Amino acid sequence: SPDVSVSTNLGSWINRKGLFSRKDTSDIFKDRKIPSAQKWIFSPDGQHIELGIAEMNLFIMLGSAGLSHELFNERLFPIGTVYDSFIARGLDALNYACYQDARFIIVGTPSGVSLAPEGGAHQSIGTPLTGISQPGLLSFEPAFADELSIILNYSFNYLQDENGGSVYIRLS
């Protein structure tokens, strides 16, 4: 994720799965006795790659990991999350990734105007057009959790399908 993991509700997942790093690194917040709900422990076993606020880097990484089958004959299932309104910050890399037939899932959350109190830049009223217009990107906007479950199941199969592609899911 290239954005604030707490406000995108990734905190508990990160705490369970850990942060990826090539070497073990202790939690600097804990070491300095700074209160935090997050466990910022990095290790080679971690499954979350923290990118800071860098949407372009997210799409470059998703595109690269999404080409693993072509490059190494081993399919990965890269999933990225981003503030939905910030999808546009990485459109060049998203466009190239889709045209190269990279396979990944991008989740834009929260979508719509739910972040309106944070200002106009946080309202994602134009991003549905990205999902609709980008070749190689299938777009969904589920309203209920049971829909999301079915969409994710379909998406993992779609990523592996010879005629498949990448998937964009907008969540509110």
PLM features per residue range, with description:
Residues 1-172:
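Thiamine diphosphate
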